[in-house]
A protein has these predicted regions:
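DPxDG-like acidic metal-binding loop motif
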Residues: 59-64, 70-88
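A generic secondary-structure micro-motif detector
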Residues: 33, 68-69
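Short glycine-rich anion-binding loops that position phosphate/pyrophosphate groups of nucleotides
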Residues: 11, 65-66
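Oxyanion-binding and handling regions
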Residues: 1-44, 48-54, 88-130
């Protein structure tokens, strides 16, 4: 089972490609404020670098938090859009063993249908001054 993994709650974002529990590729890059611009290219390059296309991917595992509001929002939006577009099962996990747990859940046939963020606290959104 070929699985794409996505983790974007930190300044350094991570994507991976797995065949079951076996890591085929894993990349970390300093995405910071360019995450929305870079994540799609990084995923496409990861797949192409291993002679894989979307027809080969059978599921998506993503880290749902806690972490950066914006980083989680971007990463989960990309994961959900890919899941919907390619009709792939998606699972989201939030503990230190997120990757192993997510892969096990996919292999067991689980599908969250929609990966939701877990921020760990209220989002700090600036209130209007008036």
């Amino acid at each position: 089972m070929i699985i794409l993994t996505i983790r974007t709650e930190k300044p350094d974002s991570e994507i991976g490609l797995y065949d079951g529990q076996t890591q085929l590729a894993y990349e970390t890059w300093p995405a910071h404020r360019q995450l929305a611009e870079t994540i799609h290219r990084k995923i496409e390059a990861l797949l192409a670098g291993h002679q894989k296309g979307w027809q080969d991917v059978q599921g998506i595992v993503c880290f749902q938090g806690p972490g950066s509001f914006t980083g989680l929002r971007i990463g989960l939006t990309v994961a959900n859009a890919l899941s919907y577009s390619y009709q792939l099962p998606i699972v989201a996990t939030q503990n230190p063993e997120w990757l192993e747990m997510g892969i096990r859940r996919l292999e067991a046939g689980e599908d969250d249908s929609l990966a939701l963020p877990f921020y760990g606290a209220d989002a700090h959104i600036t209130l209007p001054k008036k």
